[in-house]
Amino acid sequence: MKKGFDILSPLAATLYNLLLLYVVYFVARIIYLLVNYSYFAQGLTTSHLMEMLQGGLVFDTSAILVTNIPYIVLMLFPLHLKERPFYHRLCRGIFLTINGLALAINLCDAVYFRYTMRRTTTTVFSEFSNEGNLGGIFLTETLRHFWLVIIFVLMVWGLYRLYRTPRLDSRHLSWWRYDLATLLSLAAVAPFVVAGIRGGFATAVRPITISNANQYVDRPVEAALVLNTPFSLYRTIGKAVFVVPDYYADRQEMERIYTPVHQPADSVPMTKKNVVVLIVESFGREYIGALNATLENGRYRGYTPNVDSLIARSITFTRSFCNGRKSIDGMPSILSGIPMFVEPFFLTPASMNHVSGIASLLAGEGYQTAFFHGAQRGSMGFQAFARSTGFQQYYGREDYDADSRFGGDDDFDGMWAIWDEPFLQYYAAKMSDMKEPFMTAVFTASSHHPYVIPDKYKTIYPEEGIIMHKCIRYTDMALGKFFKTASQQPWFNNTIFVLTSDHTNMSDHAYYQTDLGGFCSPVIIYEPGRAPEVQDKIAQQIDILPTVMGMLHYPKPYFSFGIDVLNTPADDTWAVNYLNGIYQYVKHGHVLQFDGERTKAVYALTDSLMQHNLMGDGRWKKEEGQKLLPEMERELKAIIQQYMERMTEDRLK
């Protein structure tokens, strides 16, 4: 028995150590849940939580086995070095390093989730590849979440203490039996490893992907809880992001249902007004009092008195949405009319596609175009995107520093960019230097991590509510001063202003933490001299390009996935976004959730907390849903197929 135990000891120790990792992944998932509990709390029962935890085991198994292949091979491959202490110290070191890193990634992503509402994928490396401040960001978050660091240290220490080393005594080993036993162990384990990585033994089982998490969830946001970050990272390495579905074999039928190619709406001569697009970092609809008249039983005032004043003079919409959850999603949506499906296309090989946008369209009509962002050149890939879509000039931190009219790098926030207040004044001044007509866009930065404001404003805008609110107040003040300065310029009355956010951010209201609420962004159109109006329509970021083209009476065909919302009947306005493998399509007073093959849920927009899935309501399906459901599916499928075909065929202009 002693000899038999020695021979099988490497296998027993390997299995034991791998089982420890399930505990590590389980604890990391519970921490992920607790850190972001408000996003998962709705409808979370004990039985549903158990269902998601059970589903999580499938993805944990895959991640554990993929990341530990080197360790498994080293432990089970027949090497006579394995009876030596240094060899097992090496194996233990590899085990702790690999799995310590996996744990750290999971814990870090628990903090990052609230910004994206999903698990991190490999596109994060492209997204932040040009940032030189990642060390400072990491240090700031480490200090802010020091308790996660303590948990990390304790868990790695626990792995170290509980780690089991094979008990081998070379004096009692029969080497040929030992070699045979280890080879057989490796051969026996191999199919289980392959099956665990794939997600099952059956030959019909395709290797599991991120989208498989949706079979365990009731809401798209919950997929992040079922998944783990190491799995999400390795499953998106080198993968084809855009796959063309076969919903429509007849292209003409698809074109009749939906086309992103727009024809001129009328023959009115083009009005060459200036166009100014303000993309305000993380400036979600939730923070704006004027867009939340019924929130908190009508008592809510928000944090944006200056934007509230602007709204009183502008065109807004009863429902408005962003088309992604990251800054790099917002840029193509707002400036080129291209939403984010699956991954930000500008972080994929499709970034080499030829893309049009507001800038290129208007440059062709004699406009001078410029993009402004107060960070260093190259930050977030904005400069590359701006150039590819037709912006003739780019002004960043370096250009601000070189302008003697302003404070130079003394106005740098120490982390990301020039503070919003001075940079927006610079923006206004530079537009006064430009020849009309011009088209410009600015991307602000201060309402962003690490959520700090200039020292001189800390007593004016103290901490309140969530950490984001003081930053929103500061940026709102900066916007108010910008419009005051702009109103004194000769170009002001000949300008169309559009204000939106790149995406949403932290929330402290349940409505804005739902699958759809997390995409609620403002779309504000201000044209001096035009009567203000709240239109009972659905608007989205990708509508900005065609709406501006309609306001200008642009005379040529152009490309955008959105619509001219001002010249579209309310019943025909819609919005679309993508979250954790689910497409959300908003139209006709409902939101439909579609996983690419079938509809998972339908909610009435009046069901603000998305608590009543109408797919389970037989009466609704027989009555209202009998016509509505197939119509919405048909339209959404046409949008998806048009998107995927054009991405893969380079037909985005």
Functional labels for PLM-detected ranges:
Residues 529-653:
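Membrane-interface soluble catalytic domains
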Residues 110, 136-139, 282, 503, ...:
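Conformational gate/switch positions in structured elements
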Residues 6, 10, 48, 86, ...:
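Exposed alpha-helical structural elements
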Residues 201-560, 567-573, 577-579:
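Soluble catalytic regions of membrane-associated enzymes that act on cell-envelope
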Residues 2-227:
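Transmembrane and membrane-interface helices of multi-pass
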Residues 56, 60, 107, 137-138, ...:
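Residues that form generic nucleotide/phosphate-binding pockets
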